[in-house]
Design a protein with these regions (language model features):
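Cofactor-binding active-site loop characterized by glycine-rich and histidine/acidic residues
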Residues: 30-171, 385-386, 414, 418, ...
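Non-catalytic terminal/interface segments that mediate subunit docking, oligomerization
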Residues: 309-451, 528-536, 543-544, 550-553, ...
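N-terminal capping segment at the start of a domain
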Residues: 8-22, 182-183
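A short glycine/serine-rich beta->alpha loop
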Residues: 16-25, 53-61, 104-116, 345-349, ...
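Terminal amphipathic helices with adjacent charged low-complexity linkers/tails
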Residues: 53-54, 240-249, 253-333
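Thiamine diphosphate
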Residues: 91-103, 127, 131-134, 140-145, ...
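A short, small-residue-rich loop immediately preceding and capping a beta-strand
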Residues: 20, 56-57, 108-111, 141-159, ...
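A glycine-rich helix N-cap at a beta->alpha junction
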Residues: 78-89, 170-182, 205-209, 446-461, ...
């Protein structure tokens, strides 16, 4: 029976890829046995309840092998992946896109495809499960109790982010993380002997992982024994499974020819004969469906039913905790954050927005028990520390400060995994200039609709002495270009509070907070509530103004000072604080006209970053005071003056406009 089901997985993949004339059959054919074993013997999922929070998670880190996952989901009974959807693989509007997409297809636990990120994301799943189990489980009531499984390939393990995350997972002793390594000695360009020769198991042993070798990737009993051994090891586990890419293809197996191209009709026919598969394309024997129903769907439904009874009993035994758990199950925060939770701030109060952020995130941490995060070895510079808690590790699972180490990319992907798991609000910090290290993770936050908060400090050339390697220039423009990402650069402590509030209330959009090292003064006109609009009027000395200054972050203080100088010269000026261009762009036309009336063409935008994004606001008649070169090393006041960020220069630019 098992051989028939394994071949059903293979040929669903082969046939769908042939029909699409696009895809990667090699991994489907080679990894089918381990995937079959995982789904029918280990993975505890319920196709009728695909979002069950205590299900085991499965991450196909080798996302190019998506038909392996779709075949498994179809056979297991997930409604989203009907046979029609299998036949529509890689077609417009289908539930079976080229790489798995979270939120698009039920049963897909994470968006994968960029290699390495799946392993790192799985690390976040495992850490989320551990925290929630420590917080809410009680004797006899293991409400959160599941494993996270991964299938990865050689390419995943070559990527640096998997190494960062594996080092971190070993440090954290995340023992419910099990990675199955599809080790087939082939990559797209040829054989791995030309590009990847270290002992992966030795490397992972050094990270603090349990490792094992299955020498025959078709030996289901050996695979099963290795998984059971891994689960009992008390460590994260890597099981190297030696496979043959394109297994069963007489002329292509074991070569890179089967990695990323359809088999074609002739080789498919030969493979059918070689594997004894006497069925038409997309024809699946009833016995295979029965196998998956009994060993995946029915087994999972029984586990789900037992768990729901456990939760009901838990509500009786622990009603206060159960109320929080019920909110988590429903996808809500266990406690609601409100604007009134943040203290009022006096005008004129001066503080760096990184410090304002520290104050605000501690307000959030006090209110929300499931709010946690950390920094890439910069907590005391990013000001990301929750003051009531210590560091989280295996011995202190309830602490909410996470020390990611100098692993920015892994930090972003781990945060994604924690957010994907559900039940948590998470954040991570580093210097803004180092956001490039984790930009690929930020992009996947946005693509997956995950409300992760990124805290990026030291936001401009005002860093000063550290010089151009540490002074962001192009970073704001780059992050603003990512769809479904809200970038906030607050002007003062009040706007920083509001930006944090917007971040925590977000459901489907990640947030970037871009914060200063230098002190900024709370302006009289900044407004907590209006930050929700992305831009608003912060200063105006006449209702018939003829000049608009648009500024973000630290430049709002500069713009207001320049406006007051212009006012003393008889100028009529409006200053607009635009903490988030993304949020402002989403407002309706009427609000945009209210803030930036088309009739007023005399406009200047002020921001210590690349200028290109600002011309859509100032137009051809306006001007931009920005930076399109790298920064410099000197005291901040000298750097700012040399780059023209002074009241005198800004007034001059405005007066030179027609």
């Amino acid at each position: 029976m098992s051989n028939l089901s394994v071949n059903a997985i293979r040929f669903l993949g082969i046939d769908a890829i042939n029909k699409a004339n696009s895809g990667h059959p090699g991994v489907v054919m080679g990894a089918a046995p381990m995937a079959y074993n995982l789904f029918t013997k280990e993975l505890r999922i319920n196709p009728a309840q695909p979002n069950w929070i205590n299900r085991d998670r499965f991450i196909l880190s080798a996302g190019h092998g998506s038909m392996l996952l779709y075949a498994l989901l179809h056979l297991s009974g997930f409604e989203d992946v009907s046979m029609d959807e299998v036949k529509n693989f890689r077609q417009w509007g289908s539930k079976t896109p080229g790489h798995p997409e979270f939120g698009h297809t039920a049963g897909v636990d994470a968006t994968t495809g960029p290699l390495g990120q799946g392993i790192a994301t799985a690390t976040g799943f495992a850490q989320a499960e551990r925290f929630l189990a420590a917080k809410y489980n009680r004797e006899g009531y293991n409400i959160f109790d599941h494993y996270t499984y991964v299938i990865c390939g050689d390419g995943d393990l070559m990527e640096g982010v998997s190494s960062e995350a594996a080092s971190y997972a070993g440090l954290q002793k995340l023992d419910k993380l099990v990675v199955l390594y599809d080790s087939n000695d082939i990559n797209l360009d040829g054989e791995t002997k030309d590009s990847f020769t270290e002992s992966v198991r030795d490397r992972y042993n050094a990270y603090g992982w349990h490792t094992a070798l299955v020498e025959d990737g078709t030996d289901l009993e050996a695979i099963q024994a290795a998984i059971e051994e891994a689960k009992a090891s008390g460590k994260p586990s890597l099981i190297e499974v030696k496979t043959v890419i394109g297994y069963g293809s007489p002329n292509k197996q074991g070569t890179n020819a089967v990695h990323g191209a359809p088999l074609g009709s002739d080789e498919t026919a030969a493979t059918r004969q070689a594997l004894g598969w006497n069925y038409e394309p997309f024809e699946i024997p009833a016995e295979v469906y029965a196998d998956f129903k009994e060993n995946v769907a029915d087994r999972g439904a029984s586990a789900y039913e037992a768990w729901t009874k456990l939760v009901a009993d838990y509500k009786e035994a622990h009603p206060e905790l159960a109320a929080e758990v019920e909110a988590i199950i429903d996808g809500r925060d266990p406690v609601e954050l409100t604007p009134d939770d943040f203290p009022a701030l006096e005008n004129g109060f001066s503080q760096a927005t990184r410090n304002s952020s520290q104050d605000a995130l501690n307000v959030v941490a006090t209110k929300l028990p499931t709010f946690l995060g950390g920094s890439a070895d910069l907590a005391h510079s990013n000001m990301t520390y929750i003051k009531t808690d210590g560091l989280q590790d295996d011995a202190n699972r309830l602490n909410r400060n996470i020390q990611f180490g100098v692993r920015e990319f892994a930090m972003g992907t781990v945060l994604n995994g924690m957010a994907l798991h559900g039940g948590l609000r998470v954040y991570g910090g580093t210097f803004f200039v180092f956001s490039d290290y984790l930009k690929a993770a930020v992009r996947l936050s946005a693509l997956q609709g995950l409300p992760v908060t990124y805290v990026f400090t030291h936001d401009s050339i005002a860093v000063g002495e550290d010089g151009p390697t540490h002074e962001p220039v192009e970073h704001l423009a780059g992050l603003r270009a990512i769809p479904n990402l809200n970038v906030f650069r607050p002007a003062d402590a009040r706007e920083t509070q509001a930006a944090w509030y917007q971040a925590v209330k977000s459901e489907k959009t990640p947030t970037v907070l871009v914060l200063t090292r230098q002190n900024l003064t709370v302006e009289e006109g900044t407004d907590f509530d209006k930050v929700a609009k992305g831009a608003y009027v912060v200063y105006e000395n006449a209702t018939d103004f003829d000049t608009i200054l648009i500024a973000t972050g630290s430049e709002v203080n500069l713009a207001v000072a320049a406006a007051k100088e212009l006012a003393s010269q008889g100028g009529k000026v409006r200053v607009v604080s635009m903490p988030s261009t993304d949020v402002f762009d989403a407002q309706d036309t009427a609000y945009k006209e209210e803030i930036l009336p088309n009739a007023v063409r005399r406009r200047v935008a002020v921001e210590m970053g690349a200028t290109q994004n600002w011309y859509k606001y100032v137009g051809l008649d306006g001007a931009v005071l920005g930076i399109d070169t790298f920064g410099a090393s000197a005291p901040a006041s000298k750097v700012l003056a040399e780059y023209g960020f002074t009241v005198e220069n800004l007034v001059k630019i405005i007066n030179n406009l027609k």
